């Protein structure tokens, strides 16, 4: 099986978000779609591989976040024989993306949403298949296996392709921007809202290592071969994020004070990692700004969820 990495040019930036084209014999599958604006790039990669949209058997989304699944409906519309494969909690949102669109539009504003994501097209329910943990589907000379991986999102799975010695990890095995690898491996977790769970995120990293695959393909970004090194860096920074959450809880922080604390502490954790890697003056360091902000939001949201559950338990 051959794996082709497609740079989706997300946010008009190279090396930020990828989709993957899997080719085995006369069958093709896409893992991730990025946004509807990325679909021409995916189809161009398919043509370059000597295949047609009619030969696409599967379109796979690791989770429903729009930089991963926003183009699923548009891609399915031009791949007439494809089945969309999704986590059971993600599949309903592919069929009816109303809530996802409303939430993202509220965050970004209508104009910015349109600029980033274009039109989100529903996928007919009859063409969507939900995969349970451990499920397999036939593909080419082998199978694709699905492993549920909470921590980043409750509707997340990773895709194991043993015939390619590969696991496609979405956001469950961190972010590795190619532009920041000059001084060696620089990987970090995504703890964005609304499902960040430190313990589950640690477990997801371990589950990915346990697949035994020699190559990981995170959506952000590209083929990685040092899975053990990635896991070490991810566990370290997950511990740092968990410590921020615990300190904020112990200090009773809430509202703007909680948000400011999380932003400052997450920024400090990233700054320490940047300094240790010798990247303080790297021209592409601004790539991290959005991730720092989202990670801090995720920590604050996780604490709010914890407190809500506590209050419910007390009655």
PLM regions with names:
Residues 35-37, 55-67, 93-148, 154-217, ...:
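Metallo-beta-lactamase
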Residues 69-79, 97:
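Metal-dependent catalytic neighborhoods of phosphoester/phosphodiester hydrolases
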């Amino acid at each position: 099986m051959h794996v082709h990495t497609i740079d989706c040019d997300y946010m008009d930036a190279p090396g930020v978000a990828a989709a993957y084209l899997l080719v085995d014999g006369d069958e093709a599958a896409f893992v991730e779609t990025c946004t509807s604006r990325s679909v021409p790039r995916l189809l161009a990669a398919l043509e370059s591989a000597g295949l047609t949209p009619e030969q696409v058997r599967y379109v796979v989304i690791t989770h429903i976040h729009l930089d991963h699944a926003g183009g699923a409906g548009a891609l399915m519309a031009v791949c007439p024989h494809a089945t969309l494969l999704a986590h059971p909690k993600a599949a309903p949102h592919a069929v009816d993306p109303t809530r996802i669109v409303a939430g993202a539009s509220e965050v970004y504003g209508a104009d910015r949403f349109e600029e980033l994501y274009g039109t989100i097209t529903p996928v007919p329910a009859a063409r969507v298949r939900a995969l349970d943990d451990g499920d397999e589907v036939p593909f080419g000379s082998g199978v694709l296996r699905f492993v549920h991986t909470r921590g980043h999102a409750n509707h997340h799975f990773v895709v194991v392709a043993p015939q390619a010695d590969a696991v496609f990890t979405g956001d469950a095995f961190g972010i590795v921007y190619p532009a920041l690898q000059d001084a060696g491996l620089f990987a970090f977790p995504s703890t964005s809202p609304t499902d960040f769970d430190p313990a589950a995120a640690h477990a997801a990293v371990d589950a990915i290592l346990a697949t035994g695959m020699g190559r990981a393909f995170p959506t952000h970004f590209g083929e990685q071969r040092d899975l053990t090194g990635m896991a070490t860096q991810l566990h370290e920074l997950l511990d740092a994020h968990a410590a921020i959450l615990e300190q904020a809880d112990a200090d009773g922080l809430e509202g703007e004070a909680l948000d400011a604390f999380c932003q400052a502490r997450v920024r400090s954790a990233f700054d320490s990692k940047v300094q240790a890697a010798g990247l303080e003056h790297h021209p592409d360091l601004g790539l991290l700004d959005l991730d720092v902000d989202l990670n801090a939001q995720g920590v604050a949201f996780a604490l709010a969820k914890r407190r809500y559950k506590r209050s419910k338990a007390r009655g």
